[in-house]
């Protein structure tokens, strides 16, 4: 049996005894175990308060966790393990009741070991050398398996990453989410005489709000909650002969502002397109054909960034630039466009696309080889296929369980085609009316006012 005694100084007293060997100060019990009990009492007997300071039950030093069935520091953990493995026997030269602290814990090993046992440390929890080695081998095996799984995960190639980074950068450079340029447009005009058309438009917005509330409480069915059939009935007599010119002017009071907004957005879409990898390699004729045919679809995709499910509106900065359905009706648009537009925005918002997915979808939308007026179908299709491959690879990595996400995104492109057709038809109708076409910008008239030849 190994015996290790504490050193005694020339005065006959150990450093431990000369130090703070008393366990009570001024008659108050302040042991480490008392402090631990106080720190854990708020969370119950079986739950340790993670926010409370962890204190070693042996010496009061900062604890690193439970070791051998007790909360201890690394030093006392090692001391207990060594003592048990060596089957050491220590003798206290004093009364066997030394107070163990961080500073004097090396001075009386007997009382330190006794304290370890008193707080519940058990030698049965100590692993043998063979068990330690098996544990190390198991940890190493798990690390190797994790590394192998990581190596098997699908990864984007450098080229695919470069494409995504280019598109994200292009979007950031051509989409100002502060909407600071909106103050340069002709100002929005929402007020005017309360005519039948304005009243119907207000009802449209009111019912949209009701639909929004229903959607928030029951998001499982967009089609049933966003019921526009009642709204359509309100507009049955919108073109009746007794509609006055004043009524018509009030109904289109937002046309100048929204025409400027769309014209501005078209310019930004052009800037975005020029930064899509491969777009500038196309002929000028194909670039123009693609832009004229897809511009409004890209604008609708981008506008989803400002669309709110709470009130079915587009918030573009201050209150003057918060657009509701009522505002869109005052630019000459009807329910044939607004109903599918709002449903599209809601559905797209619910997909919760990453920014990378959003910009890829815009680029795929723009590079559609079946657009009217396109000449080099093969080349454009190759560019689009490459982007589709990147999108699918990204989805596989970021959404391992989202097998249907890609299909849902492609379906949104089909929805955009229908919206595009109706939007162009309504804008062409406006362009044929001199009193309204004069409010449109030349760029808007060029893109929406005539068919692509």
From Swiss-Prot:
One of its GO terms (cellular component) is nucleus. Residues 159-449 form the NR LBD domain. Pfam families: Hormone_recep, zf-C4. Detected in embryo 24 to 48 hours after fertilization and in gastrula. SUPFAM superfamilies: Glucocorticoid receptor-like (DNA-binding domain), Nuclear receptor ligand-binding domain. Its main location: nucleus. Gene3D superfamilies: Erythroid Transcription Factor GATA-1, subunit A (3.30.50.10), Retinoid X Receptor (1.10.565.10). Keywords: Cytoplasm, DNA-binding, Metal-binding, Nucleus, Receptor, Transcription, Transcription regulation, Zinc, Zinc-finger. Calcitriol binds at residues 175, 265, 302, 306, 333, 423. It is found in: Nucleus; Cytoplasm. GO terms for molecular function: calcitriol binding; lithocholic acid binding; nuclear receptor activity; RNA polymerase II cis-regulatory region sequence-specific DNA binding; vitamin D binding; zinc ion binding. Composed of three domains: a modulating N-terminal domain, a DNA-binding domain and a C-terminal ligand-binding domain. Homodimer in the absence of bound vitamin D3. Heterodimer with RXRA after vitamin D3 binding. Interacts with ncoa1 and possibly other coactivators, leading to a strong increase of transcription of target genes. Nuclear receptor for calcitriol, the active form of vitamin D3 which mediates the action of this vitamin on cells. Enters the nucleus upon vitamin D3 binding where it forms heterodimers with the retinoid X receptor/RXR. The VDR-RXR heterodimers bind to specific response elements on DNA and activate the transcription of vitamin D3-responsive target genes. Recruited to promoters via its interaction with BAZ1B/WSTF which mediates the interaction with acetylated histones, an essential step for VDR-promoter association. Plays a central role in calcium homeostasis. This is Vitamin D3 receptor A.
């Amino acid at each position: 049996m190994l015996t290790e005694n504490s050193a005694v100084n020339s005065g006959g007293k150990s450093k431990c005894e000369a130090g703070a060997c008393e366990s009570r100060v001024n008659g108050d019990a302040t042991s480490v175990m008392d402090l631990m009990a106080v720190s854990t009492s708020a969370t119950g007997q079986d739950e340790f308060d993670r926010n409370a300071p962890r204190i070693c039950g042996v010496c009061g030093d900062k604890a690193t966790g439970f070791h051998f069935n007790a909360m201890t520091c690394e030093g006392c953990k090692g001391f207990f393990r060594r003592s048990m493995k060596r089957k050491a026997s220590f003798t206290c030269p004093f009364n066997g009741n030394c107070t163990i602290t961080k500073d004097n814990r090396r001075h009386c090993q007997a009382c330190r070991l006794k304290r370890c046992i008193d707080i519940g440390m058990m030698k049965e929890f100590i692993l043998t050398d063979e068990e330690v080695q098996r544990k190390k081998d198991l940890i190493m095996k798990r690390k190797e398996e994790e590394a192998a799984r990581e190596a098997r995960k699908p990864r984007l190639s450098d080229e695919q990453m470069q494409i995504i980074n280019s598109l994200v950068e292009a979007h950031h450079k051509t989409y100002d989410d502060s909407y600071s340029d909106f103050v340069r447009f002709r100002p929005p005009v929402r007020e005017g005489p309360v005519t039948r058309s304005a009243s119907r438009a207000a009802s449209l917005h009111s019912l949209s709000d009701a639909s929004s509330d229903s959607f928030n409480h029951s998001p499982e069915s967009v089609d049933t909650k966003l019921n526009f059939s009642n709204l359509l009935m309100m507009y049955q007599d919108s073109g009746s002969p007794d509609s006055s010119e004043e009524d018509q002017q009030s109904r289109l009071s937002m046309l100048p502002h929204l025409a400027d907004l769309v014209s501005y957005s078209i310019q930004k879409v052009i800037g975005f397109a020029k930064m899509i990898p491969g777009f500038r390699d196309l002929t000028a004729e194909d670039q123009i054909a693609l832009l004229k045919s897809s511009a409004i679809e890209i604008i609708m995709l981008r506008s989803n960034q400002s669309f709110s499910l709470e009130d079915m509106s587009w918030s573009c900065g201050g209150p003057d630039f918060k657009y509701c359905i009522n505002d869109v009706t005052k630019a000459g648009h009807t329910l044939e466009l607004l109903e599918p537009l709002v449903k599209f925005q809601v559905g797209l918002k619910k997909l919760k696309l990453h920014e990378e997915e959003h910009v890829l979808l815009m680029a795929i939308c723009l590079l559609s080889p079946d657009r009217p007026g396109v000449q080099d179908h093969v080349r454009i299709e190759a560019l689009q296929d490459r982007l589709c491959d990147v999108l699918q690879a990204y989805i596989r990595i970021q959404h391992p369980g989202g097998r249907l996400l890609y299909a849902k995104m492609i379906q949104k492109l089909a929805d955009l085609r229908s919206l595009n057709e109706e939007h162009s038809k309504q804008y062409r109708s406006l362009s044929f009316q001199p009193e309204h076409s004069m409010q449109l910008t030349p760029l808007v008239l060029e893109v929406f006012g005539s068919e692509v030849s």
